[in-house]
């Protein structure tokens, strides 16, 4: 058992292979957080808490004359609100009498021999290889009939602990839940830095690192999606922690909507670490008997730096979040027509692209935006999911059949959650769009957001999508979402439920995705939101790969894919080779470099292959062959970042097979100088006592030698040039 409970049922120690998490219900039934870190025994660590009268830190009535006992200074597992803890709370409740108070105390616990599900939301699931365990701690509110269940999952071999919570209203009167996070954790004695991932459209997930001080460090999204601007995954690490040293705690929210993640030192220099649904524009009305569930947060600890932490997240997401026919099945190398044609295409153009792609070994053609309704630009047509047979010279089934006869798979782009005002759907159902009565709604890309909380909207979309997919025998769908959500108002929701709409929107999207995939179980679904605007573990439950960014510039992609790698498996990274000058930056990079960067992802092309040179066509063949050769290595192997957050003139990364029989190292020169210095890089992950041959010069050395001495290139890489180096075990 990974969940250990003391004989008196008040001390809980969650054990994974390399980490421990401990909490304790004290004599006043306050649930205290004692420890999360390197694996320890099950001894009670409550002695680590130093209680003292801090002044202006009030005392609950159970403390009697003891002024040292204060909710304002104790390391808590569930900090309430309005009752004496003045730090950021985890939960806020407005009662029927208008008061704000939440004071939850320990009541009981239950242990389950399997992982837990969350109604209507994605969560880690059990496999034949590993099943989780679950601890449910029931807390009761001191002065009302409200029950809070803290839910902990443990995946012992993966070094993962999950947190979620469920609030149940057992009282006679309704309550308003105005904040409820997935977890809160008070860390007592370390100085931490936070690593988070910021950005913007076409430049997502830039890794940034700042110290956690008494001023709060907070990131989040109120855009209705996890967003391009911040990612719902952060790391708290000890000062100076690096790839191979230092303590690190990761937190990754399995959710695709508004979120917040925060850390702050308190007056005792304890760090309160929190994550969950953003409280802005959030208010859930709970009648008697109703409940609210938070999304799941995935926690993981590494005592040996960031690389191990990332590898733990890669494994848990790849094995226990990603699902479906393509969880492990080899994914086809694709060609997408978007940057080749944008909206200006017809059947003839698409078939020419497919014919050339097939000759070069590409396995699937994806038809992007513009095939439906009156969609000649991005100002009309969204919602009218009917094939424009005039533009396509027939039905989608006819085009798909022609592609399939070439021996290729066929994919299609959709943007189900959006609607154009210039569409037949909007003219028939204007109330299906989010819009506040009396206000002109905000437009973005000249489109509005469908009310995904409505069952009739989801039924329409499900019928349209499944009909097209089944009729044309579609193999792949790219599911896009090209704006943020605002003007949130539902014409069918009660007014006292409007504070629920942002969350219910996400639940509606999840519901549609679940039913769509159940109806099309063999489909490969690739997520997208203007690229990486919804690149999160919640969406990965439905789409095992996500278009990582609308920016296909190979040099910008180094930063984007670097930031993505801290939490998300390389197999989830949608990454393509595109034309130069690049359409987003105007930069010109070597064709080989573009391929090497895209190989660190699901791999494909965004161009008209009829317009490239014969030399470049040969490079496509070589890249396609390389993808097949290294597929298992890049999609299932261990990933190492060899260059870091500090400024360098090259970027390098490495894949190592799980059996350590081979490794692939890639270097890209990012800056050039006069009288250039040699490139020297680390090598990681090779078995210490095995011999490996390097493909550069056929040098054979022990793994421990490569791991410690590294690799020097004896050739000068020009700016933006790349090189792949393979290490093969000598048997």
Language-model features, listed with the residues they occupy:
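Polysaccharide-binding surfaces and accessory modules of carbohydrate-active proteins
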Residues: 5, 10-21, 30-264, 280, ...
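Conserved, mostly hydrophobic/aromatic
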Residues: 18, 165, 289, 335, ...
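Glycine-rich, aromatic-flanked loop segments that form ligand/cofactor-binding clefts
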Residues: 70-117, 243-257, 300-325, 362-369, ...
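Short Pro-Gly-centered flexible turn/kink motifs
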Residues: 100-106, 284-303, 720-728
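Carbohydrate-binding surface patches
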Residues: 243, 644-687
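Aromatic-lined carbohydrate-binding/catalytic grooves of carbohydrate-active enzymes
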Residues: 326-463, 476
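Active-site neighborhood of glycoside hydrolase catalytic domains
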Residues: 393-395, 427-429, 433-590, 602, ...
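C-terminal beta-sandwich/jelly-roll accessory domains of carbohydrate-active enzymes
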Residues: 671-731
